[in-house]
Each structure stands twice: as C-alpha cells, then as structure tokens.
Amino acid sequence: MALGPSPYYGVSFFQFFSVFFSRLFSGSLFTGSLYIDDIQIIVFLAISCSGAFAGTFLVLRKMAMYANAVSHTVLFGLVCVCLFTHQLTTLSLGTLTLAAMATAMLTGFLIYFIRNTFKVSEESSTALVFSLLFSLSLVLLVFMTKNAHIGTELVLGNADSLTKEDIFPVTIVILANAVITIFAFRSLVCSSFDSVFASSLGIPIRLVDYLIIFQLSACLVGAFKAVGVLMALAFLIIPSLIAKVIAKSIRSLMAWSLVFSIGTAFLAPASSRAILSAYDLGLSTSGISVVFLTMMYIVVKFISYFRGYFSKNFEKISEKSSQY
C-alpha cells in the first residue's frame, strides 16, 4: 500500500469517481501504488459480487434468517480453530472456510434440534442458537486477544485497516462462487424451487445444499478478514431482495443483484471519503453501505407499488372508456 500523499485526500463525492476511474483507465491501479481507497473499492466489489452469487439462492430458498444466524455463529468456528492451532493471523483461507462450513452445519443442526425437542418456533430457535454461539465466540476471542473492543470491529468492520493482502482472499472467494454458480446453475435453480422434482431428475440435493453452505461460508470468511459481519450479511441478502421486486427471471434476479451490489460498493467508499473531506468525520464504510442498500430497497419498493397502482387505475379507466 502506498505511503505517499493520497490523490483522494480532500476530494468530494463526484471527484472521488473522477480520481478512481482516471487511475483505472491510465493503468495506475495495475502498475502504480494502491491507496486505501483503491483497496476498499476492490475488496468491496469482490465481496459484493460474491454475495450476489450466493444471496440469490439464499433468497429463493427463504434462508435469510439462516444466513443471519450463520453470519454470527461462524465466528465460533473460526475462534475454535484458532484455539486448537494456537494461530490467530496465519491460518489459510481454506482452513477458515472449512471451519465456517462446519459451524454453518452445526448451526443448522442446533436450530433443528431445539425446534423439535423444545417445541418452539424456528425463529425462536434460530435466535437462541446464534445469540449463544456468537456470545461464546466473543468471550473466547477477547480471552485470546485481550482486546475488549474486537467484537465491534468484527461486526462493523474496519475498512481503514485494509491492506493489499486482503485483496487475494476475497478474489479467491468471488472466483469460487462464480465457478460454482456457472457450472451448477441449473441444479441450484431446480433444487431451490422443487427439491422433490430435482431429486427425481437425478440432481444430488444434498450436494447442492453443501455447495450453498460453502458459498455462504466463503463469503462470510472473506468478509470477516476484511470488513466485518454486518456488510457481509447486507450484501448477501439485501441486493437479492431488491432485485426480486423487479426481476422476471432467475438470470435477471442475479443480474440486478450484481447491479445493486456493485453500485453500493462504489457509493459507500465515495460517501465515506466525501464526509471525511467535508466534515472531518470518519464513518463506518460498511455501515454506510447498509444504509444505501436499505434506501435502494425502499425506493424500488415504492416505485413498484406506485407503478402497479397507476397501471391498475389506467386499466379501469380504459375499460370504462371502451364501454362508452
């Protein structure tokens, strides 16, 4: 990462894009030094795109609450691996992903076990499991690191601490998710709508479930190492929820998810830098991204509602006029 004066220093919201794209098209991003704003854009783009690939099928399967639970409980698996290996920062991406997958399956088992044993609703058992495992992981993590504030950084992230080394893990994650989505697209779609029919076609349902858990776990691990759990969960669920309002097919659902994710990946760092330049106030970039995604969802929902309202009224007026 570059140590000299940043070209992004003191820029406004629109100047941020001018600086970034001028560096992109001039080749400075590939041949020159990378600044923290460049790294934020690259990492956010990778996380947002990988989240759109996995989130599309999570939303189709109505697994948003499960993804919310796993996004918190996955920390328990990562902490346990660190305890057993006595390593905190040198673990490989593969090891962390396997730990995350194991925790994701443990979370699903505990939710199922509590729901059926104690006869409570699935929402209640989900809340109990992720609250328990997440609190245990924070206690163990504070015990390991002697840092009482590390839980805040894991939830909100710390985009200002990103380095060039954070680019490689999220790049591997997006490539893995893209390959799985492309080659298993038909199986993922079919099993998401009708698992019985998919099984009759010879599609290995259990393997498809494991692939989705792998995608979810890989996204969360990449985000934990970069920007925290809040932004990961936002990019996993909200873009697909927005796209679901306007999409007419699965491919368009995924395409719109990518559009909203990529747009937020650019808007959040630009807004964070603009606020810092104008008011000397440093805000959480991941928090800003969640605000943008929520605003997009509200706007798209309102537009969809009013478009449906006016189209219905227009049809009624047309029917009445045709009668005369």
Curated annotation (Swiss-Prot):
The chain crosses the membrane at residues 1-21, 39-59, 64-84, 94-114, 125-145, 165-185, 201-221, 226-246, 252-272, 286-306. InterPro entries: ABC_BtuC-like, ABC_TroCD. It is a multi-pass membrane protein. Its main location: membrane. It is found in: Cell inner membrane. Gene3D superfamilies: ABC transporter involved in vitamin B12 uptake, BtuC. Keywords: Cell inner membrane, Cell membrane, Membrane, Transmembrane, Transmembrane helix, Transport. GO terms for cellular component: ATP-binding cassette (ABC) transporter complex. It comes from the Bacteria. CDD domains: TM_ABC_iron-siderophores_like. One of its GO terms (biological process) is response to zinc ion. Part of an ATP-driven transport system CPn_0346/CPn_0347/CPn_0348/CPn_0349 for a metal. Belongs to the ABC-3 integral membrane protein family. This is Probable metal transport system membrane protein CPn_0346/CP_0414/CPj0346/CpB0353. It comes from Chlamydia pneumoniae (Chlamydophila pneumoniae).
